[in-house]
Structure formats: C-alpha cells, structure tokens
Amino acid sequence: MTSGESKTGLKNVYPSAKKLLPKVEEGEAEDYCTPGAFELERLFWKGSPQYTHVNEVWPKLYIGDETTALDRYGLQKAGFTHVLNAAHGRWNVDTGPDYYRDMAIEYHGVEADDLPSFDLSVFFYPAAAFIDAALRYDHNKILVHCVMGRSRSATLVLAYLMIHRNMTLVDAIQQVAKNRCVLPNRGFLKQLRELDRQLVQQRRQAQQGEDAEKCEQEP
C-alpha cells in the first residue's frame, strides 16, 4: 500500500472538482412544480454510478459510508477537515468528537434513524449550516456519512444544496446522483419535497418583491 492509498481505497475516488459543477441554467422556470416521490426516485435510478465507499458530489463535499468514517488514516491522508455523522449514536456509527480528538477534524453528529417515520427535517438547517461553514474556506474538505452513505447522509447533502446553493430538489438530486449511488427512503423524500415547496415559494415571493420595487423606481 502506497502512502497515497488507504485500506478502504480512498485514493481513486476523488475526481477533479471542476467536473462536479452543474451546468448553469438561465433562471428557474416559473412553472416549476415539486415532483412526486416516484418521479424523484426515477431521477436517482437514472445514470447512478456503481456504489463505492465514498464519492465527491460537490467540490470539497463528499458522501461516504461507515467504513470511510472509521478509517482515520484514510481521512487524514485525504485531507478531511470536517465530518458530519448522520448516524450518530451508540446503536449506529458510534464515533463522536473523541474518535477524532487527535486529528484536525471538526465533528458534527446527527442522531437519526433510517426510517420513513423519522423526522430528519428538524436537522436540515443546522446540518446545512455546518456544511456551509466548512466550505467557506478552500482548504477544507467535509465528509457527510451514515452507515451506507445512501439515505440519511444523502438527504442532508440534498438539503444543503437546496438551502445554500439555491437548487431545486430536482437539480440537487441530479447533482448528487450523477456522482454517487444514493436513495433516501420515502419518508425523507417527503420531507425534502416539503422543503422544496417552501424554498421555491420563498424565492418566487422574493422575485416578485424585486420586480415590484423595479416598477416603482421606473419614471
């Protein structure tokens, strides 16, 4: 094993960040409507890459599994500075700040169960804020993980892209799914759909306010 590799094979799963950025569209369609759960699931299935331990889904933002999170050597070699554990707790991935205490890693834990009945939405904004704070500095790199890196962690990353990157749920799913095989459970999808509706409504209201202000300023 070379110095650039880890026992989980992290070396070969860090693509160039430039390849991850989505194509920029001219504005958001005024008639956009949040799709149903089945339509969203089809987006996940379409073109999803083969499952691996960890993938970069946005520049400096990675989704991974328990194996990745427990590999302290691999995390250090890869240069991770932040870890968001979406399966924090004794009966899930029991790491916590002490697990990384002798490493330059900032930890944030979310105690969540991968069940459709679990309300993960209460963690959307705190988790998104943690990710956003980490990505404000170019030298930082954050791992968001759960057990498999498919449902809980993916849901929180999707929420981040929607809240802080102004993406619709469809845009966020397409961004993540082209880089990693993920599939949030139906309950989490329902919560993301509700977040999508709220954010789209807020943006439309903000745009209407800007348009009204422009009209008032015209002679």
UniProtKB/Swiss-Prot annotation:
Subcellular location: Cytoplasm; Nucleus
GO CC list: cytoplasm; nucleus; protein-containing complex
Binding-site residues, substrate: 145-152
GO biological processes: glucose homeostasis; muscle cell differentiation; negative regulation of ERK1 and ERK2 cascade; negative regulation of MAPK cascade; protein dephosphorylation
Pfam family, any one: DSPc
Keywords, sorted A to Z: Cytoplasm, Hydrolase, Nucleus, Protein phosphatase
Gene3D superfamilies referenced in this protein's UniProt entry, alphabetically: Protein tyrosine phosphatase superfamily
Residues forming the catalytic site: 146
PANTHER family named among the record's database cross-references: AGAP008228-PA, DUAL SPECIFICITY PHOSPHATASE 29
Family affiliation: Belongs to the protein-tyrosine phosphatase family. Non-receptor class dual specificity subfamily.
Protein's job: Dual specificity phosphatase able to dephosphorylate phosphotyrosine, phosphoserine and phosphothreonine residues within the same substrate, with a preference for phosphotyrosine as a substrate. Involved in the modulation of intracellular signaling cascades. May regulate glucose metabolism by activating, AMPK, an energy sensor protein kinase. Affects MAP kinase signaling though modulation of the ERK1/2 cascade in skeletal muscle promoting muscle cell differentiation, development and atrophy.
Protein name: Dual specificity phosphatase 29
Record organism: Bos taurus
Species lineage: Eukaryota, Metazoa, Chordata, Craniata, Vertebrata
